[in-house]
Structures are given as C-alpha cells and as structure tokens.
Amino acid sequence: LPDLSVPSSASGVVGVYDVSSDWTPIYDKSELPGYYIAIGSSGNQFKNAPTAGRLMAELITAVEAGHDHDSDPVIYRTEHTKQEINLGTFSRKRALNENSSGTVMG
C-alpha cells in the first residue's frame, strides 16, 4: 500500500473490533446462499489464520457439494496432528457458552 502513510492528523484509516457474545469465533455459512463468514474472533485469532482458512475451505467445499452443515456439522481434520474438529462448535446457530469468561480465554 504505497499510498498509505502515517497522517499528521486524523483521517480515514480505521479498524473493526469484532467479538461474538461468548468470545468463540463464528466460522460458518450464512443465510445468504454462497456467502460464508469467519467473524467474531476479537482479533486474537490471527495466529490461527492458516487453520481457519483451511477449515473454511473444507466447510465451503462440503456445503457447496450439498452437505447440510446445520443438521450434520462438517468435521475438519487438522493437517499435521490429524485431530478432528467439529465445526458445529463455531456455528452461527450454536448454543452460546453460558460459562464463558467473556475473554479471549473462553
């Protein structure tokens, strides 16, 4: 971004801080067909971006092929450890974690 410099006064460069109610990110499809979301990470999930990208790719591929993620959540297997992650954990329709600490620690 060569035209982006440090201004001497306030200008139009801003950021957005997003966080879900229970501080668990939402990685899911939306109600709009073909539109997928990776939101609510509070900015602390940047270090997980490669995994988030891979699990979103898996989710999108499955849903676009006809998988009903809402009734049968996609399972993502991590690349290196082969651990299974139930993507229903990050569903927009999940039950909120009432025991959440309300912080990035969950």
Q: What residue ranges belong to the model's regions?
A:
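Flavin-binding catalytic cores
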Residues: 1-16, 29-32
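Short amphipathic alpha-helical surface micro-motifs
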Residues: 7-10, 18-20, 70-73
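Active-site loop of classical SDR/Rossmann-like NAD(P)-dependent oxidoreductases
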Residues: 16-21, 48
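C-terminal lid/capping helical subdomain adjacent to the catalytic/cofactor pocket in oxidative enzymes
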Residues: 31-106
